[in-house]
Amino acid sequence: MAKLGVIADGISQNFEYALDVMNEFELEYAELQFLWGKEVGDLNTAEVNKVQNLVNAHGVKVSCISRHIFGGLLVGEMQQDNSVYLEHLDALRRCIDMAKVLD
């Protein structure tokens, strides 16, 4: 059987409310993009810990951390000395770190 989930901010960027709705509809998996007005990868350590506590309390699993990384960059901008490229690379690292915490 297919796994049932939802992009959480499609319900609301208020993550607690989104989790309540997910529980109401028995949705087990949450894809995270925007929480509390921030894009994932921009959450601080306390906010990531709050996400972890909330998903555990609601019995939900995180299926995907989805950030708009490298979107809009031109091929010529994909260079290690390009500051915008490096910002996107840092965002990718933060998302990977968040995924490890939520695993």
Model-derived regions, located:
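N-terminal pre-domain/capping segments
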Residues: M1-V101
